[in-house]
Curated annotation (Swiss-Prot):
Involved in protein export. Acts as a chaperone by maintaining the newly synthesized protein in an open conformation. Functions as a peptidyl-prolyl cis-trans isomerase. Its EC number is 5.2.1.8. InterPro entries: PPIase_dom_sf, PPIase_FKBP_dom, Trig_fac, Trigger_fac_C, Trigger_fac_C_sf, Trigger_fac_ribosome-bd_bac, Trigger_fac_ribosome-bd_sf, Trigger_fact/SurA_dom_sf. Consists of 3 domains; the N-terminus binds the ribosome, the middle domain has PPIase activity, while the C-terminus has intrinsic chaperone activity on its own. Signal peptide: none annotated. GO terms for molecular function: peptidyl-prolyl cis-trans isomerase activity; protein folding chaperone; ribosome binding. The gene is tig. Residues 163-248 form the PPIase FKBP-type domain. Belongs to the FKBP-type PPIase family. Tig subfamily. This is Trigger factor. It catalyses: [protein]-peptidylproline (omega=180) = [protein]-peptidylproline (omega=0). The keyword Signal does not apply. The lineage of its organism: Bacteria, Bacillati, Bacillota, Bacilli, Lactobacillales. It is found in: Cytoplasm.
Length: 427
């Protein structure tokens, strides 16, 4: 293979490489054997057409494009490796020559990885807002949430208060004329829930069962029913029942109702304290990691970040997100329908921090390279096993999906992140 690379401008160049006849001839044979079964030529059964007759009628050149498509990925990868360059986006190919009996010559306009000039990335001083301490108030707050989840609604004597639930009939009208969707019977409405138009629920506070209240509200200007948007409406509302939450007593029985693995309230508090501590420890480590890496990126200089790298990161992030949705049983079409968004909206959402993520990836890769981080066979095996467990897949399936080079890269990146994070000092 003949390979040459010419720099055209910063992070861009022209890669020229050849595909030898030793590769071309077998590829042409494979393409011919694939297409001949579908070719109808008088005097020959399908699949029995001699190569010489095919070349005479159609020309060997008719096979060239399919053969090139089959050969190009491997040839391009080999050329990139031989040229000693790191490409970061899809190339633009151009065929320079495809002469019969001659090596094919291909040109590729490529974008190369930008130079990263590392600054300080070890022993960084960082500031984080997260804390590892778990307070009594946080434990009590979690128990109180669970306690409220077990609350029951009971009939209440007297006027409704914010947080109570009322059972109502209502009839809405605009200028004395009732409108579609403005009527309801025996509707349970939580006061303060925000279920109804702003101002509706507040006007029921202070009223008791058996009362009828004229609730006057104005529909928002952006209300979904355009014929009602911005208009004043009156809802004649009859309150049938007022209910309030009755929470269970804060005792050992409550603790057992919340968690069958504990016997006492003190045990529940201790369990929650441990869980909160573990969660806050993880959040703290994540915060230190993010702050340290952000600092390492800020200390580095990236020479002319190619726009193509940012675009590739957007596509990668979008595909990863939609893939995660798919694994949860939500197809892309279903997701866009549910959210009322489009593929373009999703791309714009990820564009916001794609440049930052791209710079972070480049700097962490540069740290891994500067430190000479590599992956041992044992580390690769452990990574495969871990991924198989995380994604509930067979180990062999993971090996099929991920090349050894990809695994080595990921392990080196993890080591670089660990170095930056573990040496950081929190101020």
């Amino acid at each position: 293979m003949s390979v040459s690379f010419e720099n055209k401008e910063t992070n861009r160049g022209l890669l020229t490489f050849s595909i030898s006849q030793e590769k071309i001839k077998p590829a042409l044979d494979r393409v011919f054997n694939s297409v001949k079964k579908d070719i109808a030529v008088p005097g020959f059964r399908k699949g029995r057409l001699p190569r010489a007759i095919f070349n005479q009628r159609f020309g060997e050149e008719a096979l060239y494009q399919d053969a090139l498509n089959a050969l190009l990925p491997e040839a391009y990868e080999a050329a990139v490796k031989e040229a000693g360059i790191e490409v970061v986006a899809q190339p633009q190919f151009d065929v320079e020559s495809m002469e019969k009996g001659q090596d094919w010559v291909i040109k590729a306009e490529v974008v190369t990885k930008p130079e990263v000039k590392l600054g300080a990335y070890k022993d960084l001083e960082v500031t984080v807002e997260a804390t590892k301490e778990v307070t009594d108030a946080e434990v009590d707050e979690r128990i109180e949430r669970e306690r409220n989840n077990l609350a029951e609604l009971v009939l209440k004597e007297g006027p409704a208060a914010d947080g109570d639930t009322v059972v109502i009939d209502f009839v809405g009208s605009v200028d004395g004329v009732e409108f579609d969707g403005g009527k309801g019977d025996n509707f349970s409405l939580g006061l303060g829930s925000g279920q109804f138009i702003p101002g509706f629920e507040e006007q029921l506070v202070g009223h008791s069962a058996g009362e009828t209240v004229d609730v006057v509200v104005t529909f928002p200007e952006d209300y979904q029913a355009e014929d009602l948007a911005g208009k004043e409406a009156k809802f004649v509302t009859t309150i049938h029942e007022v209910k309030e939450k009755e929470v269970p007593a804060l005792d050992d029985e409550l603790a057992k109702d919340i968690d069958e693995e504990v016997e006492t309230l003190d045990e529940l508090k201790e369990k929650y304290r441990k869980e909160l501590s573990e969660a806050k420890e993880t959040a703290y480590k994540d915060a230190v990691e993010a702050a340290a890496i952000d600092q390492a990126v800020a200390n580095a200089e990236i020479v002319d970040l190619p726009a193509e790298m940012v675009h590739e990161e957007v596509h990668r992030a979008v595909n990863e997100f939609l893939g995660n949705m798919q694994r949860q049983g939500i197809s892309p079409d279903m997701y866009f329908q549910i959210t009322g968004t489009t593929q373009e909206d999703l791309h714009k959402q990820y564009e916001a921090d794609a440049e930052s993520r791209t710079k972070t990836n480049l700097v962490v890769e540069a740290v891994a390279k500067a430190e000479g981080f590599e992956a041992s066979a044992e580390e690769i095996e452990a990574e495969v096993t871990s991924l198989a467990s995380d994604y509930n897949m067979e180990v062999e399936r993971v090996r099929q999906l991920l090349s050894e080079d990809m695994l080595k890269h990921d392990i080196a990146i993890k080591k670089a992140v660990e170095l930056i994070t573990s040496t950081a000092k929190v101020k």
